[in-house]
UniProtKB/Swiss-Prot annotation:
One of its GO terms (molecular function) is protein transmembrane transporter activity. Residues 153-163 have a biased composition (Low complexity). Belongs to the Tim17/Tim22/Tim23 family. It is found in: Mitochondrion inner membrane. One of its GO terms (biological process) is protein import into mitochondrial matrix. It comes from Mus musculus. Keywords: Disulfide bond, Membrane, Mitochondrion, Mitochondrion inner membrane, Protein transport, Translocation, Transmembrane, Transmembrane helix, Transport. Signal peptide: none annotated. Essential component of the TIM23 complex, a complex that mediates the translocation of transit peptide-containing proteins across the mitochondrial inner membrane. It comes from the Eukaryota. This is Mitochondrial import inner membrane translocase subunit Tim17-A. One of its GO terms (cellular component) is TIM23 mitochondrial import inner membrane translocase complex. InterPro entries: Tim17. Residues 144-171 are annotated as: Disordered.
Length: 171
């Protein structure tokens, strides 16, 4: 499948870690901008200053948390590819569950099970949506009739023509 044709694992981990940091920082910045604006005192200057302060203090922390999640997920995913010898959706689902469990380990076994279930379910939904999207997109472009490549199988009266017209039209 083309979906899984990506760069080798050491670079994939760094790439996913950086992408997750960027998503967390931008998404966290937008969320914190609204939160800081809403929780600031009345007055546009106070609200804008509160919004900017919330962005500066919380967005990098959220980006770092996302980067840890992305790096751990990619590390487990690459390990699963190496161990199993194939790259399929089960690796991502298992990686999501293990990442959720590992990141919740400090909160106890109940939290680990809950986070593992959420991580696995979330990644299963993402992988399922990707598979459905690929199937529906490929159904839009069905394979046409297969033409023979061997010109000896064509009737003798029919010569292969050029896509730009036949040379005989100019004689």
């Amino acid at each position: 499948m083309e979906e899984y044709a990506r760069e080798p694992c050491p670079w994939r981990i760094v790439d996913d870690c950086g992408g997750a940091f960027t998503m967390g920082t931008i998404g966290g910045g937008i969320f914190q901008a609204f939160k800081g604006f809403r929780n600031s005192p009345v007055g546009i200057n106070h609200r804008l200053r509160g919004s900017l302060t919330a962005i500066k203090t919380r967005a990098p922390q959220l980006g770092g948390s996302f980067a840890v999640w992305g790096g751990l997920f990619s590390t487990i995913d690459c390990s699963m590819v190496q161990i199993r010898g194939k790259e399929d959706p089960w690796n991502s689902i298992t990686s999501g569950a293990l990442t959720g469990a590992i990141l919740a380990a400090r909160n106890g076994p109940v939290a680990m099970v809950g986070s593992a279930a959420m991580g696995g379910i979330l990644l299963a939904l993402i992988e399922g949506a990707g598979i459905l999207l690929t199937r529906f997109a490929s159904a839009q472009f069905p394979n046409g009739p297969q033409f023979t490549e061997d010109h000896s199988q064509l009737p003798s009266s029919q010569l292969p023509s050029s896509p730009f017209g036949d040379y005989r039209q100019y004689q």
